Design a protein with these regions (language model features):
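Conserved short beta-strand elements that form part of the metal-binding/catalytic scaffold
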Residues: 34-85, 128-150
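Extended intrinsically disordered, low-complexity coil regions enriched in Ser, Thr, Gly, Ala
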Residues: 21-41, 87-91, 102-126
Length: 163
């Protein structure tokens, strides 16, 4: 693996939990996180998981502590890295570190060239995301995400607590 920094800008810690409400209560108690925006039963567009098309349905919530975004995900249905994580860690925990990139395809090529393995990808509108695993960090995935204008605006509103 390369000693160069990962592409993009670190912005997110992602948790996967078996129960979204309990996970949010835990983070609020632990971190004093303000309220989270909750999105229920979201189906990923163009879902792909471990080599083939996938229907990935999950609920998720976003909140900020300072400049760090916390994403909390509860898998609902389908095969996904989220369900796979809960099979290994039934109580849930830190699943990924998220990096915002301007060029998703170039960042993907960079990670693959470093020996990372693409596990899951999908889109929401023009937003593209992918989860990667590596032997360097077997417990936590790396997510790269290109944020379209709508999602950037939503995240700004969440950070400002104006949603």
């Amino acid at each position: 693996m390369s000693s160069r920094p990962l592409p993009g800008t670190f912005f997110q810690i992602g948790y996967v939990v078996p129960n979204l409400e309990a996970g949010l209560a835990h983070l609020n108690a632990k971190l004093g996180a303000p309220r989270f925006m909750v999105l229920r039963e979201i189906v990923v567009e163009n879902g792909w998981f471990r080599g083939g098309p996938a229907t990935i349905n999950h609920s998720m919530a976003f909140g900020y502590v300072g400049d760090v975004q916390f994403e909390v995900i509860e898998p609902v249905a389908g095969n996904s890295t989220y369900a796979e994580f809960l099979d290994r860690v039934p109580d849930g925990g830190v699943h990924h570190l998220g990096f915002s990139v301007e060029d998703y395809d170039a960042a993907t090529a960079d990670l693959l060239a470093r020996g990372y393995k693409l596990v899951q990808r999908g889109t929401f509108g023009d937003t593209k995301f992918g989860y990667f695993e590596s032997s360097d960090d077997p417990g936590t995935m790396t997510e790269i995400v290109y944020l379209d204008a709508n999602v950037r605006g939503m995240f700004a509103n969440i950070k400002a607590q104006t949603f």
